[in-house]
């Protein structure tokens, strides 16, 4: 009896001096609840106003004590206020176990429930407590129809005993017939069986076996802080299902609720963090995360395809199918015509993020308007509602006569007029049927985006099989080859990116298919057209910039493509162009008789390790982004270097060549008349002495003369990735009289430190003709989109490499700097720096440890049930004291397991929150780096949303640290206190080893450093 006597003596000392409180035993002395309130008031007088309590208010006193202990101290309520009223003699073992938790807490030890309860915010203090004592109805269990209080934050705690009085009077149970020592509310809310003390789990006012308290969806045992209530009473679900922990990348992030109007799928896996959102995340944000994560918090990646169907001019549907799971809901967008202003948004998210330097480049397009069944292996990240800024948006305009799968028509008012002018320009002569009609042209500066499509890391072979099927354009942002073929399509497809300054045009009329592609960071337009005599070849320019012209065929990708052109077609197209673009024709920089040749071919040499007929366009376009400092001149068939590439250009007898210039960037040349309003005109073919290199050198316009504002705008343009291609050489030749020869030689391996402002050395820029191979280039290839790049700000650190000094600001570089990790080599997936941390625990390992704890708890409960039966049978015997010590030890072991489980859950949450924070930080920096004058209202709104999510994520992480610190203060002396108690009882027991979790120790040390 020593253990019980010792605990009883401790209670007597704590309650000494309090009115109406006398501790003479461990049963009836606690029935009125004043003893519990007295113990709490002695240690925490701020929590209870003891002077207002009355001895006769049994229900109110017990309810107040249980509620305060649970919500403020984290001590789970093993007792119920109704039981204390209904039973003349309360259950002795229950009171002993419950009071022992008071003892443990106020002696620096965690309560039996672990850490979860401490994190719970205080509940409403306006509950009606009066009117209970005078009622005489018998005790009864809470019914499912009872009004339930709104669920508590799952990221903070386990919901426990909480009843919403709602202003109504709930009858207080009076003494009911029953055996002494039994508990009225001891029936599990799921299985209906008796719940032993060691098995008790209270949630939302109902009692459960811990093993019965499982997720309705995945049937996993619900863990502290990782579940949430549903609308159905007594039903809970995981905020983060264990099956999704190992398969879903937290970067998908969680981020919740991207741009308004975006198509989002809410599956909510990241409940504990990033959403735990958290999204993660937190309901994700961690936004997304991704899939919001997630999903409400995270993002899932499913293999599927995007298919848009063109309905009669009323509605259009976007189907997002998944072969790995159920299809997402169909989104219907109402449209009125092929030039409708309705927008169809398909948002995307990538499990590896958009900042991967090895997978994206400024000239890449994630456009996959129509994908045939053969291309269904394309990855379609399933949608956290990621912001449209993370993907290249594409507008698609289709003729309504398409009978098969067609792209949804969606044009904004600012884009429709420009596109109509382009359609008119690209239509066949009057003798041939025009695929679409276009009203009067009207130039515009930018083309809005409508559809975003995901990043693909697998080969994409896209075909448009039969006639009247729109052209298929796929240009993934990965380094995987892409083959584009459109044999007999009669419907024009226009693809444009929102941030492009000038268009890159691909006109393929051999099959009467018109494709227009705008590169997002293109400065000089490139027109690639292939004609068979039915369509004119005309130079087109956006905002007055001068294009270079190359010809190829969209019907077939071959090493050499040649087709004759007709003079009448050229004249007709030029007349249309002059009407649509008066700034270009008015400047006098291009005459009808001097238009570029209509028949030419393109052949590009790719690295020797590439496979023919499959050209990764991101590598080609990425070559031009390394060193943007160069000047432009004209030489006949003269090879010169462009940044880190050597280029041969020949068009008839006029060949513009591009060579690097130290410390300068000439974005254009000035012939007899400069293009009005254009800061960076491209090279124009001129006759006479202007053809020589001397004439062009004399007319070079240094970049230093540009206004600071103009330079700043160009520098601010984001480049999503930094290409890495070494020892590649590209050469183009033609079988026609007028051809374009292109040789691209990378000098990436020559990267070395150099002083600020200096240019690349001649040795570093020399071409390497020994590594050249001839490969076909797809018609959608943009070989000159990034020849001209803005001059970056000079670096103060002179030891930086030339490439870093000349590259514009990149989100991936900023993020890498923040994460203290280098860029991944080509072809490798980008690993989050959080995962590289020495104390990072993979989700698989976390789940394994949680399963181990689950098994130990199950075994512990079996022991506890047997020990409880022995204790009840031995009440008053000499063996009771020994059994009670064993009982306290068992409760302590359970306490340690629950604490370890809680730490693992918080560890998982913190890791997801950290990844979510990094994602938010990268996107937020990119938006904040954008000049205020260029920010749209959506950008400003998105910036505020990200800022709010970022602050919430940081606060959540800070809360986790605070909670852990509070618990550690009590846990430090826990084992010693238990040993001291046993020794005071006169029992010689071997000290048990503590298996406290050490998963936070390394992180704490690194944080202090």
UniProtKB/Swiss-Prot annotation:
Sequence positions bearing Phosphoserine: 110, 143, 153, 249, 766, 768, 832
Low complexity bias: start-end ranges: 731-746, 755-769
Biased composition (Polar residues): 144-171, 348-419
Compositional bias annotation for Basic and acidic residues: 694-730, 791-817
Keyword Ubl conjugation: no
Subcellular location: Cell membrane; Cell junction, Tight junction; Recycling endosome; Cell projection, Neuron projection
Cellular component GO terms held in the UniProt record: actin filament bundle; bicellular tight junction; cell-cell junction; neuron projection; plasma membrane; recycling endosome
Keyword check for Repressor: no
Ranges where the record places region Mediates interaction with RAB13 and is required for transition from the closed to the open conformation: 913-1009
Renumbered residue ranges of the record's region Mediates targeting to the cell plasma membrane: 261-805
Annotated LIM zinc-binding domain residues: 186-248
Coiled coil segments of this chain: 841-880
Recorded superkingdom: Eukaryota
A molecular function (GO) term: actin filament binding
Forms an intramolecular interaction with the C-terminal coiled coil domain keeping the protein in a closed conformation: annotated span: 1-260
Record region (Necessary and sufficient for interaction with actinins): 261-393
SMART domains named in the record: CH (SM00033), DUF3585 (SM01203), LIM (SM00132)
Annotated spans, Disordered: 114-180, 247-268, 348-447, 655-834
Region annotation Forms an intramolecular interaction with the N-terminal Calponin-homology and LIM zinc-binding domains-containing region keeping the protein in a closed conformation: where it falls in the sequence: 806-913
Domain notes for this protein: Exists in a closed and an open conformation due to interaction of the C-terminal coiled-coil domain with an N-terminal region including the calponin-homology (CH) and the LIM zinc-binding domain. The conformational change is regulated by RAB13 and RAB8A. Adopts its closed form upon interaction with RAB8A and interaction with RAB13 causes conformational change from closed to open.
Function per UniProt: Effector of small Rab GTPases RAB8A and RAB13 which is involved in junctional complexes assembly through the regulation of cell adhesion molecules transport to the plasma membrane and actin cytoskeleton reorganization. Regulates the endocytic recycling of occludins, claudins and E-cadherin to the plasma membrane and may thereby regulate the establishment of tight junctions and adherens junctions. In parallel, may regulate actin cytoskeleton reorganization directly through interaction with F-actin or indirectly through actinins and filamins.
Record text on subunit structure and interactions: Interacts with RAB13 (GTP-bound form); competes with RAB8A and is involved in tight junctions assembly. Interacts with RAB8A; competes with RAB13 and is involved in E-cadherin endocytic recycling. Interacts with RAB8B. Interacts (preferentially in opened conformation) with ACTN1 and ACTN4; stimulated by RAB13 activation. Interacts (via calponin-homology (CH) domain) with the filamins FLNA, FLNB and FLNC (via actin-binding domain).
This protein's name: MICAL-like protein 2
Gene: Micall2
């Amino acid at each position: 009896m020593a253990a019980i006597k010792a605990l009883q003596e401790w209670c007597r000392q704590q309650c000494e001096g309090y009115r109406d409180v006398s501790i003479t035993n461990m049963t009836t002395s606690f029935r009125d609840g004043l003893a519990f309130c007295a113990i709490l008031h002695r240690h925490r007088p701020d929590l209870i106003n003891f002077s207002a309590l009355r001895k006769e208010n049994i229900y109110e006193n017990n309810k107040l004590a249980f509620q305060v202990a649970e919500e403020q101290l984290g001590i789970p309520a093993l007792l119920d206020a109704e039981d204390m009223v209904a039973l003349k003699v309360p259950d002795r073992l229950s009171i002993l176990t419950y009071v022992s938790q008071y003892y443990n807490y106020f002696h620096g030890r965690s309560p039996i429930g672990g850490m979860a309860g401490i994190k719970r915010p205080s509940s409403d203090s306006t509950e009606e407590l009066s009117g209970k004592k005078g009622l005489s109805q018998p005790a009864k269990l809470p019914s499912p129809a009872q009004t339930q209080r709104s669920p508590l934050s799952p990221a903070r705690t386990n919901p426990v005993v909480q009843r919403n009085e709602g202003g109504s009077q709930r009858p207080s149970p009076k003494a009911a017939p029953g055996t002494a020592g039994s508990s009225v509310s001891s029936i599990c809310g799921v299985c209906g069986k008796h719940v032993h003390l060691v098995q008790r789990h209270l949630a939302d006012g109902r009692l459960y076996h811990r093993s019965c308290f499982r997720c309705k969806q995945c049937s996993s045992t619900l863990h502290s802080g990782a579940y949430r209530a549903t609308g159905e009473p007594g039903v809970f679900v995981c905020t983060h299902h264990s099956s999704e922990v190992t398969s879903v990348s937290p970067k998908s992030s969680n981020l919740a609720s991207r741009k308004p109007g975006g198509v989002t799928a809410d599956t909510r896996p990241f409940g504990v963090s990033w959403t735990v959102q958290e999204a993660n995340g937190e309901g994700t944000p961690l936004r997304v995360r991704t899939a919001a994560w997630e999903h409400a918090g995270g993002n899932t990646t499913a293999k599927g395809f995007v298919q848009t169907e063109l309905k009669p001019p009323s509605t259009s549907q976007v189907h997002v199918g998944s072969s790995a799971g159920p299809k997402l809901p169909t989104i219907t967008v109402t449209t009125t015509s092929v030039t409708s202003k309705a927008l169809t948004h398909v948002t995307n998210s990538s499990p590896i993020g958009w900042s991967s330097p090895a997978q994206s480049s400024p000239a890449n397009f994630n456009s996959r308007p129509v994908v045939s069944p053969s291309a269904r292996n394309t990855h379609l990240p399933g949608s956290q509602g990621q912001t449209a800024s993370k993907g290249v948006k594409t507008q698609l305009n289709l003729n309504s006569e398409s009978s098969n799968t067609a792209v949804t028509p969606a044009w904004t008012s600012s884009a429709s007029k420009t596109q109509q002018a382009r359609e008119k320009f690209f239509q066949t002569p009057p003798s041939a049927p025009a695929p679409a009609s276009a009203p009067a042209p009207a130039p515009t500066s930018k083309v809005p985006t409508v559809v975003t499509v995901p990043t693909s890391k697998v080969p994409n072979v896209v075909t448009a099989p039969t006639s009247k099927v729109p052209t298929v354009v796929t240009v993934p942002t990965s380094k995987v080859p892409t083959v584009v073929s459109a044999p007999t399509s009669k419907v024009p497809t226009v693809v444009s990116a929102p941030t492009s300054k000038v268009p890159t045009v691909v006109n393929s009329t051999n099959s009467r298919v018109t494709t227009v592609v705008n590169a997002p960071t293109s400065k000089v337009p490139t027109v690639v057209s292939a004609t068979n005599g039915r369509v004119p070849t005309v130079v087109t320019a956006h905002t007055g910039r001068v294009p270079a012209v190359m010809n190829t065929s969209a019907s077939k990708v071959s090493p050499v493509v040649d087709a004759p052109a007709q003079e009448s077609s050229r004249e007709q197209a030029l007349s249309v162009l002059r009407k649509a673009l008066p700034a270009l024709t008015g400047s006098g920089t291009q005459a009808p008789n001097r238009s570029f040749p209509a028949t030419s071919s393109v052949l590009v040499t790719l690295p020797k390790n590439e496979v023919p007929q499959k050209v990764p366009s991101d590598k080609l376009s990425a070559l031009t982004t390394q060193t943007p400092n160069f000047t432009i001149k004209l030489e006949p068939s003269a090879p010169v270097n462009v940044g880190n590439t050597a280029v041969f250009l020949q068009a008839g007898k006029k060949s513009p060549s591009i060579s690097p210039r130290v410390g300068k960037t000439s974005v254009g040349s000035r012939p007899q008349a400069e293009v009005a309003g254009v800061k960076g005109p491209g090279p124009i073919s001129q006759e006479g002495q202007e053809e020589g290199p001397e004439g062009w050198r004399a007319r070079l316009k240094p970049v230093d003369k540009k206004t600071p504002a103009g330079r700043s705008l160009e520098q601010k343009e984001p480049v999503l990735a930094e290409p890495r291609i070494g020892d590649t050489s590209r050469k183009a030749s033609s079988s026609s009289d007028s051809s374009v020869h292109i040789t691209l030689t990378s000098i990436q391996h020559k990267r070395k430190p150099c002083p600020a402002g200096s240019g690349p050395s001649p040795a570093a820029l020399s071409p390497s003709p020994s590594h050249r191979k001839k490969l076909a280039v797809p018609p959608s290839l943009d070989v000159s989109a990034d020849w001209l790049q803005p001059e970056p700000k000079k670096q103060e650190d002179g030891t930086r490499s030339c490439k870093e000094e000349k590259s514009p600001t990149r989100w991936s570089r900023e993020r890498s700097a923040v994460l203290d990790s280098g860029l991944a080599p080509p072809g490798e997936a980008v690993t989050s720096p959080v995962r590289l941390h020495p104390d990072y625990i993979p989700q698989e390992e976390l789940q394994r440890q949680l399963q181990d704890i689950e098994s130990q708890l199950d075994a512990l409960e079996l022991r506890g049930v047997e020990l409880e039966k022995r204790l009840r049978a031995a009440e008053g015997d000499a063996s009771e004291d020994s059994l009670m010590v064993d009982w306290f030890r068992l409760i302590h072991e359970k306490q340690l397991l629950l604490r370890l489980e809680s730490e693992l859950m918080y560890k998982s949450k913190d890791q997801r929150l950290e990844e979510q924070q990094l994602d938010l930080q990268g996107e937020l920096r990119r938006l904040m780096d954008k000049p205020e004058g260029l920010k749209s209202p959506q950008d400003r709104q998105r910036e505020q949303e990200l800022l709010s999510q970022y602050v919430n994520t940081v606060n959540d992480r800070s809360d986790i640290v605070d909670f852990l610190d509070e618990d550690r203060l009590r846990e430090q002396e826990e084992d010693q206190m238990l040993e001291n108690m046993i020794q005071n009882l006169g029992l010689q027991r071997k000290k048990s080893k503590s298996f406290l979790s050490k998963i936070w120790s390394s992180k704490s040390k690194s944080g202090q450093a």
